[in-house]
């Protein structure tokens, strides 16, 4: 059965060099969900500048620095629509910088960051070695299924 994905995208950045099309996000999200039996999901992706993601990172994680992505999962929140799995906040500037540094395509790196974020929304984490190995394995498997290179070898 095809899962219905409701995706809302907010653009809150003027510093965008590359932005995936909505259909690309949907492919990446659908591929990330292949092991999940939830029929329908809702996700928000917000594209922001460094200042906003730095502020959010400090407010919610007490880290006073910008990051590539923040994930806010609502999957276990009984007060929110059961299909709404969460929000992904992505800093396009940092994703672009990282892609250049790693010498990978912008599309590939956006795919990886989106998949990484979706897995966080679904409860995967890299807070210890065992969890990191599981999460990186899944990310690599999903990326390969979409004909992208291993995101951890560059």
UniProtKB/Swiss-Prot annotation:
It is found in: Cytoplasm. Belongs to the endoribonuclease YbeY family. Its EC number is 3.1.-.-. One of its GO terms (biological process) is rRNA processing. Pfam families: YbeY (PF02130). One of its GO terms (molecular function) is metalloendopeptidase activity. Its main location: cytoplasm. Zn(2+) binds at residues 116, 120, 126. It comes from the Bacteria. It comes from Buchnera aphidicola subsp. Baizongia pistaciae (strain Bp). Keywords: Cytoplasm, Endonuclease, Hydrolase, Metal-binding, Nuclease, Ribosome biogenesis, rRNA processing, Zinc. One of its GO terms (cellular component) is cytoplasm. The gene is ybeY. Single strand-specific metallo-endoribonuclease involved in late-stage 70S ribosome quality control and in maturation of the 3' terminus of the 16S rRNA. Binds 1 zinc ion. Its cofactor is Zn(2+). It is an enzyme of class 3 (hydrolase). This is Endoribonuclease YbeY. The keyword Protein biosynthesis does not apply. The keyword Cytoplasm applies.
């Amino acid at each position: 059965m095809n899962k219905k994905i409701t995706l809302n995208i907010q653009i809150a950045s003027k510093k965008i060099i590359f932005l995936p099309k909505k259909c690309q996000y949907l492919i990446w999200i659908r591929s990330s969900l292949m092991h999940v039996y939830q029929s329908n999901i809702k996700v928000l992706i917000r594209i922001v500048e460094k200042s906003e993601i730095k502020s959010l990172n400090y407010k919610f994680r007490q880290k006073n620095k910008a990051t590539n992505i923040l994930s806010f999962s609502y999957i276990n929140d009984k007060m929110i629509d059961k299909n709404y799995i969460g929000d992904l906040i992505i800093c396009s500037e940092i994703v672009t910088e990282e892609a250049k540094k790693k010498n990978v395509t912008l599309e590939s790196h956006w795919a990886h960051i989106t998949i990484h974020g979706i897995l966080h929304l679904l409860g995967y984490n890299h807070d210890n070695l065992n969890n990191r190995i599981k999460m990186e394995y899944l990310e690599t498997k999903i990326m390969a299924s979409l004909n992208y290179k291993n995101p951890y070898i560059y």
